Amino acid sequence: MDVKIAPDWKELLAPEFEKPYFADLTQFVRQEYATRRIYPRGSNIFRAFDKCPFDKLKVVIIGQDPYHGPGQANGLCFSVGDGVPFPPSLQNIFKEVADDTGTPPPATGNLDRWAEQRVLLLNAVLTVRAHEAASHAGRGWETFTDAVVRAISERKQGVVYMLWGSYAQKKGAIADPQRNFILKSVHPSPLSVYRGFFGCRHFSRANEYLRSIGKEPIVW
């Protein structure tokens, strides 16, 4: 199957694209885009991979599914397009970045700048119906993104995994803590942020680790 995804990821994930579940997933997603309003737009489904080459990967942040409001989802977990108001979880992420590193909140919630520094902003589910959270869950995306995490774990070491909330922690459990740096906290959602996300210092701790293995830190 010819999947429109960055060449290095395409080579890495080629076996997945030939499996029956992926054919079923593709058929479902195409039908959904043809008959409903789906986010993100089709060209952005694999944008997290297009923005972050596999060979230079430094950090993995795992989300659940795309934002389902108009103009929000842009293919990177937690990220929104330029000019779009910050969703609450993203506001809380920026507050922790500011408190942790001294970097003031940015003018835009577009996290392209993180992805371009080799942060993979990976949702577990890559598409969603407008105004219907988790509407594409259980259709095969989770199997695909599990394969992504597994491929990273098997082929790379020295990667920082930021696992926020039980869902991300379960998905990231395959990553070997002896070969990587695993950071866990509650989700930055307003429902849980005061139970350990604020004050987790994941951003400075990630940079300390990257420096310790000779890699450039991330400008958060």
Show which residues each predicted segment covers.
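A polyanion-binding, active-site-adjacent surface
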Residues: V3-A6, P15-L163, Y167-K170, A175, ...
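C-terminal substrate-binding/active-site "lid" region of AdoMet-derived donor-dependent transferases
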Residues: F197
